[in-house]
Amino acid sequence: MLYVVDHPLIKHKLTIMRKKETGPKEFRELLREITLLITYEATRHIPVYELEVETPLEKTKGYYINDKDIVVIPILRAGLGMVDGILELLPNASVGHIGIYRDPETLKAVDYYFKTPKLHDKSEIFILDPMLATGVSAIDAITKVKELGGKQITFISLISSPEGVKAIEKAHPDVNIYTASLDRELNDHGYILPGLGDAGDRLFRTK
């Protein structure tokens, strides 16, 4: 299911990211901040456990989350820019990495790196990629995570295309998608319109 996190702060920050004159330093900071804000909504489903705590006045019931069961997996390379944002809220989460790029000619996924912590049916897994375009890389990543035993999977992006959302919903209907914006469409090269360009290039200043 798709969840568009519609919040004034996110709209404001995403607009700055879209501007072509926004430099890499500000782009990185905004990506981290928006990821943090989306994470707030994307973690509503995770379980909480009771414990007793003592205030300066009396004992009372409290709650905690076991963030050691949480696994954050960025899709390289642009997904790396989202990791710090989610770790600010979940500092004990494990971090894996999936290296996938989309062949510009065939638009098919090409895998080149895969390293994750041990996954099990109680792992709360968050796959990160700023741009959900064709959905090819996302579907490939989700499929591999499931093959390793992952069941509770959430996909977090900054901007999504209708085509990418439909592709994930068809291939993995059990995966929830959280995004800051559902943009209009893909162009002939598989880029999201209006989008914000190549997130990886803008993040790492490679063009």
UniProtKB/Swiss-Prot annotation:
What sort of enzyme, by top EC class, is this? transferase
- What is the free-text note on the cofactor? Binds 1 Mg(2+) ion per subunit. The magnesium is bound as Mg-PRPP.
Molecular function in Gene Ontology = GTP binding; magnesium ion binding; uracil phosphoribosyltransferase activity
Keywords from the UniProt entry: Allosteric enzyme, Glycosyltransferase, GTP-binding, Magnesium, Nucleotide-binding, Transferase
Q: Which catalysed reactions does the entry list for this protein?
A: UMP + diphosphate = 5-phospho-alpha-D-ribose 1-diphosphate + uracil
**Keyword Disulfide bond in annotation:** no
- The entry marks the following residues as binding uracil, namely 192, 197-199
Entry annotated with the keyword Transferase: yes
Q: Which Gene3D superfamilies does this UniProt record tie to the protein?
A: 3.40.50.2020
Q: What is its EC number?
A: 2.4.2.9
Query: Which family is it part of?
Result: Belongs to the UPRTase family.
Any idea what job this protein has? Catalyzes the conversion of uracil and 5-phospho-alpha-D-ribose 1-diphosphate (PRPP) to UMP and diphosphate.
**What is the protein name stated in its UniProt record?**
Uracil phosphoribosyltransferase
Provide the species name.
Answer: Fervidobacterium nodosum (strain ATCC 35602 / DSM 5306 / Rt17-B1)
